[in-house]
Amino acid sequence: FPTRRSSDLRLKVINYIQKYIDMVDTPFPKAQLVINELFDKRIGDEEFLEIYSASLYKNRQKDRITKRTNLGINKQELIVKHKEKDQLAKFCSTGEQKALLISILIGQIEANKEIAKTTPILLLDELFVHLDDMRKDCLAQYVINSKLQTFITATDMAGLNRITESGQIIYI
């Protein structure tokens, strides 16, 4: 049952990242990560196989026409919500979306440090755009304190002074 196992693995990873999003104390809004389910989790493996096989058969003609698979793990979506507001991220302001993304990023970094016992290399593009001063300061402190190797690209130097003492700036 590769689709079910893949789905379960994705859910396990998302739940682990969610644990760290909830655990880490930052001024960034807590993101809530949810994966839409393709099939009811309460059905047994045999019934799942029957339903999945029938669904694949039913979609064959559509798959041929579109030249792609229209049913499967590739159709699972990650849904992100602003936890405190109980609002889908796609309906949040650009600044809130950026803050939610940073919340997810920090959660993923902390989960990765715990699971893999490694620290990732951070690549951040236009890091401080759409953030208020308090969040800029908090993010700069996180980057500095995390001791992660970090590459930040920016078109505007405003905000980068928060971390220049701890790093090196290369002008291109």
Where are the predicted features?
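Short, small-residue-biased leader/transition segments that mark boundaries at the very start
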Residues: 1-6
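H-loop/switch region of ABC-family ATPase nucleotide-binding domains
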Residues: 153-155
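Conserved NTPase motor "head" modules and their coupling/switch loops across ABC/AAA+ ATPases, GTPases
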Residues: 8-121, 130, 134, 138-149, ...
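Walker B catalytic acidic pair
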Residues: 125-127
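A short helix-turn-beta junction within AAA+ P-loop NTPase domains corresponding to the substrate/partner-engaging
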Residues: 163-172
